[in-house]
Amino acid sequence: MPRIARLPDIVANKISAGEVVQRPASVVKELLENAIDAGATRITVAIKDAGKELVQVIDNGSGMDEEDALRCVERFATSKISDAEELDALTTLGFRGEALASISTVSHFELRTRRENDNVGIQLRYEGGVLSERGKAASEPGTAVSVRNLFYNVPARRKFLKSNATEFKHIFESVKAQVLAYPEIQWQMINDDETLFDFRSSDMHERLNFFFGDDFAGSLIEVHDDNDFLSLHGYVGKPSMQKRQKNEQFIYLNRRVIQNRMLSQALQQAYGELLVERHSPFVLLFLGIDPQQTDVNVHPAKLEVKFEDERSVRTMFYTIIKRSVRMQDFSPDVGGEGFHETSDSFSSRSSQHSDARLGFQAVPSRASSTDDLYREFQESTPKRPMPDRTRVSEQEEMFSHSADIFCEPDREFRSSDFGQVSEEFVDGVRLEPEEKDPKIWQLHNKYIICQIKTGLMLIDQHVAHERVLYERAVDIMDNNVPNAQQLLFPQKVELKPWEFEIYLEICDDLDRLGFNLGTLGTRTVMIEGVPQDVRSGSEAYILQDMIQEYQQNASKLKLEKRENLAKSYSCRNAIMSGQALSLEDMRSLIDRLFATKMPYVCPHGRPVIIRISLDQLDRMFGRK
């Protein structure tokens, strides 16, 4: 067996480069962090051939003398820390002292630097980590680093680089993350001699609109919270801006871009049912915590972070985001954002982190509160006594006449499904004889149209009722509210083996919800009582459908048990498309919808309400 020997520095640096320099974007990230730590107020990034031919970063920071310039390319040489204790109180982005050594080892590396009071600058050139040229050079104050022919001496690594489009996208995303984190810095980016952007002002809105589209900044919700433990500032997106990928989530810890699974999960849970399955919101959030409470020395890439008190960080992060999001009006406008995925962007720190430096501006809110929209509805409809919202069971009775529509959402509906109709219908719209000007109509037995002060409000009757039933089910299970009605004739249901296993898992919560159930043998369930929302005659179908949907939600969404059950219950018991509603039914549904905590989306993230303003109608008809 060969003797153990210490590796030469050049070999060790090549190995280290595999962790630090994974692709051209890694080079860009490390050079930008050095420029920011040097106190630069203007940074230029120039790229050629997606970083394979050239990565150049020029800054007007503090610069270096010749001794420091030579030392900065050595392995584990840094000005950021001097002893191990300082790792517990880092206020800089860089600190490991290995990036430039790793980069210079796998490229043709050039460094030009000058301090402001020096008459001439220093120029150093390295090939494969070896100093090949050293001398004086005319240069502006600051530092310019040029990395050419990346991985020229590591052909295996160069071979596994992706296409130019993919590599450039990673570079652009890395630059974008820093541009958004430091609005006080002027940023310029050049790709293959073409200027992509040149931000000279600190206007955050200008940058957001450039990267994500016109008027993007105006669609955001501002987050601003400080306490003795942490601060959280920035912006989060409305649910209409959600998308499948998480590449538009920017979370910073003391202005260091980070990736943290715990914070990502807390963010998803804070939005909850506002998000469609497997979608994520846009966020640009700056988390400030005492550096002694964090550990960023987890991986050479410095993206991962650990918190000393992870539970407190998660709880506060979740609470602040939820509070900021939940009181907003998310009813989309026709011709506006709608509920869709946002398009891809352009590329298809403790004491330093004050509000003034971040340059945050108040986002002009385009959303009214829930109470404002409900008030518009009330003012635009005839006066009537307000319903007693404590008499939930009586209100729910209005919808108990729905037929077996729960089990067959796509079936055709007949008037006979709903019994004898006594009210007058005109073009499919039901009118009460005592109401000459109802201001509420039902369209195709599917949507409710309401006149409001500023235009029209359209409501999907199924998902509206789903939202009402969902919140009611959660409240019943959490607070043990009596909700059962006994059956005159108990029903027997034969379950499949897998259905019976799920039944055993959720039977206690089914009991809290209002199901009075018993078992016979190994697969038979006796239904002796059901919740008040369940229509007579559909008890067995409802139970089986709830079990099936619960299983689907559990496998796809990984929900909490009670949340899963509440979603299954509300979906299977809500009135469906095709069911005619009386005027009083519609009014009651609207009243109860606006009494919920989140009336604008159903428990699965779909929109409940859409508004059409008079201004939009005027534009459609050419009046404006």
Curated annotation (Swiss-Prot):
CDD domains according to UniProt: HATPase_MutL-MLH-PMS-like, MutL_Trans
Region described as Disordered: 336-357
GO molecular function, one term: ATP hydrolysis activity
Keyword annotations from UniProtKB, A to Z: DNA damage, DNA repair
Top-rank lineage group of the source organism: Bacteria
Cellular component GO terms, alphabetical: mismatch repair complex
Gene Ontology terms describing biological process: mismatch repair
Keyword Nucleotide-binding: no
Listed Low complexity bias regions: 344-353
InterPro entries linked to this entry: DNA_mismatch_repair_CS (IPR014762), DNA_mismatch_repair_MutL (IPR020667), DNA_mismatch_S5_2-like (IPR013507), HATPase_C_sf (IPR036890), MutL/Mlh/PMS (IPR002099), MutL/Mlh/Pms-like (IPR038973), MutL_C (IPR014790), MutL_C_dimsub (IPR042120)
Cross-referenced SUPFAM superfamilies: ATPase domain of HSP90 chaperone/DNA topoisomerase II/histidine kinase, DNA mismatch repair protein MutL, Ribosomal protein S5 domain 2-like
Transmembrane segments: none
Classification via Gene3D superfamilies: 3.30.230.10, Histidine kinase-like ATPase, C-terminal domain, MutL, C-terminal domain, dimerisation subdomain, MutL, C-terminal domain, regulatory subdomain
Protein purpose: This protein is involved in the repair of mismatches in DNA. It is required for dam-dependent methyl-directed DNA mismatch repair. May act as a 'molecular matchmaker', a protein that promotes the formation of a stable complex between two or more DNA-binding proteins in an ATP-dependent manner without itself being part of a final effector complex.
HAMAP family: DNA_mis_repair
Protein family membership: Belongs to the DNA mismatch repair MutL/HexB family.
Name under which the protein is recorded: DNA mismatch repair protein MutL
Organism expressing this protein natively: Chlorobium phaeobacteroides (strain BS1)
